[in-house]
């Protein structure tokens, strides 16, 4: 079947959970949750680009320009490493790489 339905298993790091809990904007939280749900259910990730070390940045074009940094493993598991927004982008990318290095050890 060329259009085989693929579902991803989503894992979140403590760092991601902490970031998400601190998000004050309820609508931004809803957009982030919706985007994660879409990630889980389809192969097309939308507005997304690689940032190095096999880590990708998922862009949510809302308010501050939210970002979710994730790593796809085994073709079926997505690990949400950390979140942030446009203003902390470079710092978040470095942090995501650090978190991934710790996980894979």
Predicted regions and their residues:
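Alpha-helical hairpin
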Residues: 23-24, 88
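Enriched for short, Lys/Arg-rich terminal
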Residues: 1-10, 18, 29, 44, ...
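A short, surface-exposed loop/turn module that caps and links secondary-structure elements
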Residues: 34-62
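N-terminal interaction/assembly modules
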Residues: 15-18, 24, 36
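Conserved catalytic core of Hanks-type protein kinase domains
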Residues: 22, 38, 71-72
């Amino acid at each position: 079947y060329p259009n085989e339905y693929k579902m991803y298993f989503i894992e979140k790091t403590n760092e991601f959970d902490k970031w998400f809990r601190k998000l004050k904007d309820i609508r931004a939280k809803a957009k982030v949750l919706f985007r994660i749900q879409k990630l889980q259910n389809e192969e097309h990730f939308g507005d997304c680009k690689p940032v190095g070390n096999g880590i990708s940045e998922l862009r949510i074009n809302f308010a501050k320009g939210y970002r979710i940094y994730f790593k796809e493993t085994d073709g079926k598991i997505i690990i949400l490493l950390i979140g942030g927004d446009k203003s902390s982008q470079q710092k978040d990318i470095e942090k995501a790489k650090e978190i991934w290095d710790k996980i894979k050890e």
